[in-house]
């Protein structure tokens, strides 16, 4: 299934590719940086992409790290997956953190993250006095194994 997304190029996004799928079976669209940045170890930074997008109601865009950057350099999205809500119209920025031990240079045009379009189901809470019993019950963290 394909969903149409309206995208607005911002002035500092000139000549950059819009997010795109690297292969036919890819779930995530690669997104590139619209600026040069040097991320120091443990530094967090919202990297500009040079575009804004109109996401249809009932959808979100999830922001996830690129596996190669995470494996080779420790570059991650600290709030992964990040969420871009359907009512947001500002510039898409990618929050990155350098978990590596060396400074990491991002150049304008470098692929920095993946964007995944996902459907959203909103919950409606109904207060009750009791919940049904399950085998797991109140057992929390680590209760099903490590």
Swiss-Prot record:
Highest rank taxon of the organism: Bacteria
> InterPro entries annotated for this entry?
dUTPase, dUTPase-like, dUTPase-like_sf, dUTPase_trimeric
E.C. code: 3.6.1.23
Q: Which GO terms describe its biological process?
A: dUMP biosynthetic process; dUTP catabolic process
SUPFAM superfamilies linked? dUTPase-like
Its annotated pathway reads: Pyrimidine metabolism; dUMP biosynthesis; dUMP from dCTP (dUTP route): step 2/2
Q: Which reaction does it catalyse?
A: dUTP + H2O = dUMP + diphosphate + H(+)
Q: Which family does it belong to?
A: Belongs to the dUTPase family.
The task this protein performs is described as: This enzyme is involved in nucleotide metabolism: it produces dUMP, the immediate precursor of thymidine nucleotides and it decreases the intracellular concentration of dUTP so that uracil cannot be incorporated into DNA.
Q: What is this protein called?
A: Deoxyuridine 5'-triphosphate nucleotidohydrolase
- List the source organism: Zymomonas mobilis subsp. mobilis (strain ATCC 31821 / ZM4 / CP4)
Question: What's the gene?
Answer: dut
